[in-house]
Protein backbone atom coordinates (compact mmCIF):
# COMPACT_ATOMS: atom_id res chain seq x y z
CA UNK A 1 0.00 0.00 0.00
CA UNK A 2 1.21 3.49 -0.83
CA UNK A 3 0.40 4.68 2.68
CA UNK A 4 2.96 2.23 4.07
CA UNK A 5 5.55 3.46 1.58
CA UNK A 6 4.82 7.07 2.56
CA UNK A 7 5.07 6.23 6.26
CA UNK A 8 8.48 4.62 5.70
CA UNK A 9 9.65 7.56 3.61
CA UNK A 10 8.77 9.93 6.46
CA UNK A 11 10.79 7.74 8.82
CA UNK A 12 13.76 7.91 6.45
CA UNK A 13 13.66 11.43 5.00
CA UNK A 14 11.50 13.50 7.33
CA UNK A 15 8.12 15.17 6.91
CA UNK A 16 8.60 17.60 4.04
CA UNK A 17 6.25 17.39 1.07
CA UNK A 18 7.74 19.53 -1.71
CA UNK A 19 5.02 21.30 -3.65
CA UNK A 20 5.58 21.62 -7.38
CA UNK A 21 2.99 24.37 -7.88
CA UNK A 22 5.17 25.70 -10.64
CA UNK A 23 4.33 29.03 -12.21
CA UNK A 24 6.41 30.50 -15.02
CA UNK A 25 6.76 33.58 -12.81
CA UNK A 26 8.71 31.50 -10.30
CA UNK A 27 11.39 30.43 -12.77
CA UNK A 28 14.58 32.51 -13.16
CA UNK A 29 14.76 34.33 -16.49
CA UNK A 30 18.17 32.91 -17.39
CA UNK A 31 16.76 29.38 -17.06
CA UNK A 32 13.83 30.12 -19.35
CA UNK A 33 16.17 31.14 -22.17
CA UNK A 34 17.67 27.63 -22.27
CA UNK A 35 14.47 26.13 -23.71
CA UNK A 36 12.19 26.88 -26.64
CA UNK A 37 8.75 26.25 -25.15
CA UNK A 38 6.88 26.47 -21.86
CA UNK A 39 6.48 22.70 -21.53
CA UNK A 40 10.24 22.17 -21.52
CA UNK A 41 10.86 25.15 -19.26
CA UNK A 42 8.47 23.91 -16.58
CA UNK A 43 9.43 20.26 -16.76
CA UNK A 44 13.17 20.94 -16.61
CA UNK A 45 12.73 23.39 -13.74
CA UNK A 46 10.76 20.71 -11.88
CA UNK A 47 13.42 18.13 -12.73
CA UNK A 48 16.12 20.32 -11.18
CA UNK A 49 14.06 20.72 -7.99
CA UNK A 50 13.30 16.98 -7.83
CA UNK A 51 16.94 15.99 -8.32
CA UNK A 52 18.07 18.44 -5.64
CA UNK A 53 15.50 17.46 -3.00
CA UNK A 54 14.55 13.83 -3.64
CA UNK A 55 16.62 12.34 -0.81
CA UNK A 56 15.40 14.90 1.73
CA UNK A 57 11.64 14.87 1.16
CA UNK A 58 8.93 12.36 1.96
CA UNK A 59 7.01 13.09 -1.24
CA UNK A 60 6.11 15.64 -3.87
CA UNK A 61 2.74 17.34 -4.34
CA UNK A 62 1.74 18.67 -7.75
CA UNK A 63 -1.11 21.19 -7.92
CA UNK A 64 -2.66 20.39 -11.29
CA UNK A 65 -4.24 23.84 -11.75
CA UNK A 66 -0.85 25.38 -12.48
CA UNK A 67 -0.50 22.97 -15.41
CA UNK A 68 -4.10 23.03 -16.62
CA UNK A 69 -3.85 26.81 -16.91
CA UNK A 70 -1.31 26.37 -19.71
CA UNK A 71 -3.47 23.98 -21.71
CA UNK A 72 -1.98 20.96 -23.46
CA UNK A 73 1.62 22.08 -23.04
CA UNK A 74 1.05 22.39 -19.31
CA UNK A 75 -0.53 18.95 -19.06
CA UNK A 76 2.39 17.46 -20.98
CA UNK A 77 4.74 19.05 -18.45
CA UNK A 78 2.54 17.64 -15.67
CA UNK A 79 2.72 14.12 -17.13
CA UNK A 80 6.47 14.30 -17.64
CA UNK A 81 6.89 15.45 -14.04
CA UNK A 82 4.73 12.57 -12.77
CA UNK A 83 6.69 10.08 -14.84
CA UNK A 84 10.05 11.43 -13.72
CA UNK A 85 9.17 11.18 -10.04
CA UNK A 86 7.84 7.63 -10.47
CA UNK A 87 10.96 6.58 -12.39
CA UNK A 88 12.97 7.78 -9.39
CA UNK A 89 10.79 5.69 -7.02
CA UNK A 90 9.39 8.88 -5.54
CA UNK A 91 5.89 9.37 -4.14
CA UNK A 92 3.45 11.81 -5.72
CA UNK A 93 0.32 13.47 -4.38
CA UNK A 94 -1.69 14.98 -7.22
CA UNK A 95 -3.57 17.93 -5.80
CA UNK A 96 -6.72 17.82 -7.93
CA UNK A 97 -9.45 18.36 -5.28
CA UNK A 98 -12.13 16.56 -7.25
CA UNK A 99 -15.63 16.08 -5.85
CA UNK A 100 -18.61 14.94 -7.89
CA UNK A 101 -21.38 12.35 -8.14
CA UNK A 102 -20.47 8.69 -8.28
CA UNK A 103 -20.60 8.23 -12.06
CA UNK A 104 -18.34 11.22 -12.64
CA UNK A 105 -16.05 10.27 -9.75
CA UNK A 106 -15.45 6.91 -11.46
CA UNK A 107 -14.04 8.79 -14.43
CA UNK A 108 -11.86 10.97 -12.20
CA UNK A 109 -10.56 7.83 -10.51
CA UNK A 110 -9.77 6.27 -13.85
CA UNK A 111 -8.10 9.47 -15.07
CA UNK A 112 -5.72 9.77 -12.12
CA UNK A 113 -5.17 6.22 -10.93
CA UNK A 114 -4.39 4.71 -14.33
CA UNK A 115 -3.32 5.88 -17.76
CA UNK A 116 -1.34 8.98 -18.70
CA UNK A 117 -1.83 10.82 -15.41
CA UNK A 118 -1.46 7.89 -13.00
CA UNK A 119 -0.38 9.04 -9.58
CA UNK A 120 -0.05 7.63 -6.04
CA UNK A 121 -2.41 9.86 -4.03
CA UNK A 122 -5.01 12.46 -4.96
CA UNK A 123 -6.86 15.13 -3.01
CA UNK A 124 -10.66 15.09 -2.88
CA UNK A 125 -13.49 17.32 -1.67
CA UNK A 126 -16.18 15.56 0.42
CA UNK A 127 -18.91 18.17 0.14
CA UNK A 128 -21.13 16.30 -2.34
CA UNK A 129 -21.33 13.38 0.08
CA UNK A 130 -19.29 10.33 0.92
CA UNK A 131 -20.65 8.42 -2.07
CA UNK A 132 -18.49 10.76 -4.15
CA UNK A 133 -15.43 9.13 -2.54
CA UNK A 134 -16.45 5.49 -2.82
CA UNK A 135 -15.57 5.11 -6.55
CA UNK A 136 -11.90 5.48 -5.60
CA UNK A 137 -12.02 2.46 -3.29
CA UNK A 138 -11.48 -0.01 -6.14
CA UNK A 139 -8.07 1.50 -6.86
CA UNK A 140 -7.20 1.63 -3.19
CA UNK A 141 -7.94 -2.08 -2.85
CA UNK A 142 -6.41 -3.29 -6.10
CA UNK A 143 -3.50 -0.89 -6.60
CA UNK A 144 -2.80 0.40 -3.10
CA UNK A 145 -3.59 4.00 -4.04
CA UNK A 146 -4.56 6.64 -1.49
CA UNK A 147 -6.63 9.80 -1.10
CA UNK A 148 -6.41 12.90 1.06
CA UNK A 149 -9.84 14.37 1.70
CA UNK A 150 -10.41 17.98 2.77
CA UNK A 151 -11.17 18.08 6.50
CA UNK A 152 -9.89 21.27 8.15
CA UNK A 153 -8.18 23.45 5.60
CA UNK A 154 -5.70 26.24 6.23
CA UNK A 155 -7.35 29.07 4.29
CA UNK A 156 -9.17 31.89 6.07
CA UNK A 157 -12.45 31.19 4.27
CA UNK A 158 -12.59 27.64 5.62
CA UNK A 159 -14.71 28.92 8.50
CA UNK A 160 -17.54 29.75 6.07
CA UNK A 161 -18.45 26.06 5.71
CA UNK A 162 -16.18 23.92 7.87
CA UNK A 163 -17.22 25.74 11.06
CA UNK A 164 -20.96 25.39 10.61
CA UNK A 165 -22.35 23.57 13.65
CA UNK A 166 -24.89 20.77 13.68
CA UNK A 167 -27.68 20.53 16.25
CA UNK A 168 -25.49 18.46 18.55
CA UNK A 169 -22.73 21.08 18.49
CA UNK A 170 -20.27 19.31 16.20
CA UNK A 171 -18.71 21.35 13.43
CA UNK A 172 -18.79 20.22 9.80
CA UNK A 173 -15.06 19.43 9.72
CA UNK A 174 -15.39 17.30 12.87
CA UNK A 175 -18.26 15.31 11.38
CA UNK A 176 -16.42 14.77 8.11
CA UNK A 177 -13.26 13.71 9.90
CA UNK A 178 -15.04 11.10 11.99
CA UNK A 179 -16.94 9.69 9.00
CA UNK A 180 -13.71 9.41 7.01
CA UNK A 181 -11.99 7.76 9.94
CA UNK A 182 -14.72 5.11 10.05
CA UNK A 183 -14.52 4.55 6.29
CA UNK A 184 -10.77 4.23 6.56
CA UNK A 185 -10.90 1.20 8.83
CA UNK A 186 -11.21 -0.98 5.72
CA UNK A 187 -8.01 0.46 4.28
CA UNK A 188 -5.53 0.33 7.15
CA UNK A 189 -1.91 -0.31 6.22
CA UNK A 190 0.69 -2.16 8.24
CA UNK A 191 1.82 1.21 9.57
CA UNK A 192 -1.51 1.68 11.35
CA UNK A 193 -2.68 4.50 9.10
CA UNK A 194 -5.43 4.39 6.50
CA UNK A 195 -5.23 5.00 2.77
CA UNK A 196 -7.97 7.59 3.40
CA UNK A 197 -6.03 10.55 4.72
CA UNK A 198 -7.11 14.06 5.60
CA UNK A 199 -6.05 17.54 4.55
CA UNK A 200 -5.59 19.38 7.85
CA UNK A 201 -3.97 22.81 7.89
CA UNK A 202 -1.52 23.73 10.64
CA UNK A 203 -2.90 27.25 11.07
CA UNK A 204 -5.44 26.33 13.77
CA UNK A 205 -3.37 25.07 16.69
CA UNK A 206 -6.23 25.41 19.16
CA UNK A 207 -7.87 22.46 17.38
CA UNK A 208 -4.72 20.42 16.73
CA UNK A 209 -4.59 18.19 19.79
CA UNK A 210 -8.26 17.23 19.57
CA UNK A 211 -8.03 16.53 15.83
CA UNK A 212 -5.03 14.27 16.27
CA UNK A 213 -6.73 12.43 19.13
CA UNK A 214 -10.07 12.02 17.36
CA UNK A 215 -8.54 11.00 14.03
CA UNK A 216 -5.85 8.69 15.34
CA UNK A 217 -5.56 6.39 12.32
CA UNK A 218 -5.74 9.14 9.72
CA UNK A 219 -2.57 10.29 7.97
CA UNK A 220 -2.52 14.06 7.49
CA UNK A 221 -1.47 16.19 4.54
CA UNK A 222 -0.62 19.41 6.34
CA UNK A 223 -0.62 22.71 4.43
CA UNK A 224 -0.16 26.14 5.95
CA UNK A 225 3.49 25.94 7.03
CA UNK A 226 5.53 29.05 6.30
CA UNK A 227 3.73 31.37 3.89
CA UNK A 228 0.35 30.93 5.62
CA UNK A 229 1.77 31.39 9.10
CA UNK A 230 2.05 27.83 10.39
CA UNK A 231 5.14 27.08 12.49
CA UNK A 232 7.06 23.88 13.20
CA UNK A 233 5.77 23.73 16.77
CA UNK A 234 2.24 23.90 15.35
CA UNK A 235 2.99 21.06 12.94
CA UNK A 236 4.28 18.86 15.76
CA UNK A 237 0.84 18.90 17.39
CA UNK A 238 -0.68 17.21 14.33
CA UNK A 239 1.80 14.33 14.35
CA UNK A 240 1.78 11.15 16.39
CA UNK A 241 5.00 9.59 17.65
CA UNK A 242 6.89 11.62 15.07
CA UNK A 243 4.90 10.36 12.08
CA UNK A 244 1.36 10.45 10.76
CA UNK A 245 1.68 13.40 8.43
CA UNK A 246 3.59 15.25 5.74
CA UNK A 247 3.98 19.02 5.67
CA UNK A 248 3.61 20.78 2.35
CA UNK A 249 5.57 23.81 1.24
CA UNK A 250 5.45 25.07 -2.33
CA UNK A 251 6.47 28.71 -2.68
CA UNK A 252 8.86 28.47 0.25
CA UNK A 253 10.81 25.77 -1.57
CA UNK A 254 10.44 26.87 -5.20
CA UNK A 255 11.31 30.50 -4.44
CA UNK A 256 14.02 29.87 -1.86
CA UNK A 257 16.58 31.26 -4.29
CA UNK A 258 15.01 34.72 -3.95
CA UNK A 259 15.40 34.70 -0.19
CA UNK A 260 18.97 33.46 -0.56
CA UNK A 261 19.62 35.86 -3.49
CA UNK A 262 21.12 33.14 -5.68
CA UNK A 263 19.02 32.42 -8.76
CA UNK A 264 21.90 30.69 -10.58
CA UNK A 265 21.80 27.97 -7.92
CA UNK A 266 18.02 27.86 -7.45
CA UNK A 267 17.92 24.08 -7.03
CA UNK A 268 20.59 24.14 -4.33
CA UNK A 269 18.66 26.88 -2.57
CA UNK A 270 15.53 24.70 -2.67
CA UNK A 271 17.49 21.83 -1.17
CA UNK A 272 18.78 24.09 1.61
CA UNK A 273 15.22 25.20 2.37
CA UNK A 274 13.97 21.59 2.50
CA UNK A 275 16.76 20.68 4.94
CA UNK A 276 16.05 23.75 7.06
CA UNK A 277 12.34 22.94 7.12
CA UNK A 278 12.94 19.26 7.87
CA UNK A 279 15.27 20.07 10.77
CA UNK A 280 12.90 22.75 12.07
CA UNK A 281 10.06 20.22 12.26
CA UNK A 282 12.22 17.49 13.81
CA UNK A 283 13.45 19.89 16.48
CA UNK A 284 9.86 20.84 17.31
CA UNK A 285 8.87 17.17 17.56
CA UNK A 286 11.77 16.40 19.89
CA UNK A 287 10.91 19.42 22.05
CA UNK A 288 7.22 18.55 22.37
Swiss-Prot record:
Enzyme active site: 97
Entry superkingdom: Bacteria
SMART domains: OMPdecase
Enzyme class, first EC level, given as a word: lyase
Any Pfam family matching the protein: OMPdecase
Protein's recorded name: Orotidine 5'-phosphate decarboxylase
Reaction it catalyzes: orotidine 5'-phosphate + H(+) = UMP + CO2
Keywords from the named record: Decarboxylase, Lyase, Pyrimidine biosynthesis
Lineage: Bacteria, Bacillati, Bacillota, Clostridia, Eubacteriales
Gene Ontology biological process: 'de novo' pyrimidine nucleobase biosynthetic process; 'de novo' UMP biosynthetic process
Molecular function via GO: orotidine-5'-phosphate decarboxylase activity
Pathway: Pyrimidine metabolism; UMP biosynthesis via de novo pathway; UMP from orotate: step 2/2
The EC number(s) this enzyme carries: 4.1.1.23
Protein family (similarity comment): Belongs to the OMP decarboxylase family. Type 2 subfamily.
